[in-house]
Amino acid sequence: MEGDTRRMWTQSESESIRSSKVRPLPLRKVTLYLTFVLIGVADTTYLDHAGTTLYAKSLIESFSRELTSNLFGNPHSLSASSQLSTRRVDDVRLRALRFFKADPDEFDLVFVANATAAIKLVADGMRDSTRQGFWYGYHVDAHTSLVGVRELAEKGGRCFTSDDEVEDWISKLCDVRSESLKLFAYPAQSNMNGRRLPLSWCKKIRNQGETAGGNVYTLLDAASLVSTSTLDLSDAAAAPDFTVLSFYKIFGFPDLGALIVRKSAGQIFEHRRYFGGGTVDMVLTRGLQWHAKKQSSIHDRLEDGTLPFHDIIALDSAFATHERLFGSMQNISSHTRFLAKRLYDRLNALRHFNGQRVCELYKSPRSDYNQPSTQGPIIAFNLRNSQGSWIGKSEVERLAAMRNIQIRSGSLCNPGGTSGSLGWTGADLLQQFSAGLRCGDDHDVMDGRPTGVLRLSLGAMTNLEDINTFVEFVEEFYVEKVATMDSLVTPVHSVPLQQPRFYIESLSLYPIKSCGPFRVPDGRRWEVRREGLAWDREWCLIHQGTGAALNQKKYPRMALIRPSIDLDRNVLRVTCEEPGSTNQKLLEVSLLREDTELATTSLCQRTSKASTVCGDQVTVQAYTSPSVAQFFSDFLGVPCTLARFGPHSSTRYASPRKAPGAWKQYLRKFVMPGSFPQEPSPPPAEKNPILLSNESPILLISRSSVNHLNENIKANQKRNRTGTSKAVAADVFRANIVVAESLADSPKVEQPYIEDQWEALKIGPGELQFDVLGSCQRCSMVCIDQFTGVRRDEPFSTLAKTRKINNKIVFGRHCSLSASEVTKEQHDNAERWTLMVGDIVTPSYAHDYDL
């Protein structure tokens, strides 16, 4: 047994296993369920084994014993420690070949960083082997790293869009005899949907290619396949010329890859131009420029520089641990096949109340989860609501993460597979690229189609509990069980005849983006600018290495950084304090823009996937003082410094939020046709400048809505018996304005979400006018407690069930100073452009609710 946190099959699971034709791992092996190094992983449902599988605690312990019991030197030396490393590397190389049943007389194995590095090694060898260049063909299901080889193929190439095209090309290879060098590459298993391609192509191509001149080589990407299946290279005549893979996909650790070369194809590397340390017998640098490459083996010529010998020695421990835990790859293959079939069937069976499918599954018609030769344990899919609309992949992944479920979403580095499954043409994607679509962004649905997929991939340590957890997650959040009009907004008929009085309960600004709030003191009027409240999100913290703006989603401790504005002393005061601690750190910087500690730098937020402003590139002024950088770096544990983006340098604008008819479009699902007239074309949108806020100058929420949300949270937790409920504070929504109702007047009952009906606002004695731009789309950052920096499940989980429209989770309203206000002659009156706690808020109600 390995540790005390092992997981056992339940009685129901065992009965299900016995009745199935496909067998998972034997029970004696399953009881060796791994304990892992990372704290808390026992509570995690990990379904991203195609990215990397999980490593066993005993693997790390075994490797640690190796390091503490032996002295390993650089293999390029002749010392005893170096020779020990050399012997161990040779032994592991042989063990790796035998793991894939590859005869060392027929094959050589080259250690590389990963499968991509192995692909590039082959591509460079092909390019250097002849001055005429080479022709390159690849299957449409290829990983991006295989696709990239085409840029080195001077003889051109071809993307084969189907298996039939490949078969047709193979059959015609012998028709034309050619001396031109050719390389055909394909994946043994699609990393997108797990479809397995014919391994027989390599032998067919070799047989046909020999008739055509013998210059056709094959490259097999086995990285996805070998994580859960045997790769059998025992028949050298049928094996690929080059096979690439990554060991971390099999064992989780070490981070190492391999290129397995048929020795008969090794001549491809004879003209490789680059040489590194350890690959040559002699090098002349004075006078004659000459070198002699090593000829003893293929790996001696290709492994440039010092090998990662510690990682290779760790691989020996990985082989031993893997065999002890699972016995064989065949056991893992049977185990994952059983679970994948179960998961696929359950997802495929999910239906909404009206019979509509919940999951759109992207499985090849050629594949079958019961047939290991055609399908691996990967499932690619998207979700739809009951009306057939797509649910954004990013929302699903974020909500899953809140439930400790780890999955993958996006195009998965498989451009051909995803575009084909989703129906995108090359012209379509070019158009969407021009519209802003980028790899890793949050553009989930464009032109009515998803831009990526969700992926579940299973591994040796996956069990039925993991399958049940994910399916139950989908059922809880995405299966609509009854036809209801969600109580997202107050219904049309409930707009009160006698409107309630609203007032500003609190005013907050966030001087440093993603850090704590500064609450405007009661009785003090605060300036409002076109960009929002004065000093709001004028600063940010940037990573000193990448220049990316930091945010709470990645660094929750930013909530404990509390800035305040001292107008009397003209300083930004920042404190950092651990919850319950009296040890407070203090920093003050000048509010004056002429601060000599500022230096202009470029901030490219594109590098920050989690930020909603990541499409913008802005220029900020970074503080050069080492003490400023140390203040924030020490507290967050990340190298960062403070930077400023002032109102006079703003080149950012609020996102156009209003979508006339959005609420009507939602209502049309439930009412007879013709109930709503056709909307006129909207007028051109005004541009509202913003600083470093995500989407708009001002964010407003309602106290009544927060109270109602907390009632829903309490009810959900009582219904699910999840323990004592804990209300969320309004602070988690990071609003600038919290509006409350004056219940002393009629009606005396709070009206949650009535702000969804607001079109404009007049605030204060001067009736300062604001436009309501639309609703605020929420992400998992609302789950970070702003007083402790601790991440929770709520309120995002409840919002996902109660505040979703057009497949977006919304709470709060985006606002901006009215354009008419800006153009008034008296706008220079500073007293007019101010707000204060207690100011009366008078809303204008829209006839159409623009969510």
Curated annotation (Swiss-Prot):
Transmembrane segments: none
SUPFAM superfamilies assigned: MOSC N-terminal domain-like, PLP-dependent transferases
One GO term (biological process): Mo-molybdopterin cofactor biosynthetic process
One function term, GO molecular function aspect: molybdenum cofactor sulfurtransferase activity
Covalent S-S links between cysteines: none
Functional pathway: Cofactor biosynthesis; molybdopterin biosynthesis
Catalytic residues identified in the record: C413
Described purpose of this protein according to its UniProt entry: Sulfurates the molybdenum cofactor. Sulfation of molybdenum is essential for xanthine dehydrogenase (XDH) and aldehyde oxidase (ADO) enzymes in which molybdenum cofactor is liganded by 1 oxygen and 1 sulfur atom in active form.
Protein family per UniProt: Belongs to the class-V pyridoxal-phosphate-dependent aminotransferase family. MOCOS subfamily.
Protein name: Molybdenum cofactor sulfurase
Organism annotation: Neosartorya fischeri (strain ATCC 1020 / DSM 3700 / CBS 544.65 / FGSC A1164 / JCM 1740 / NRRL 181 / WB 181) (Aspergillus fischerianus)
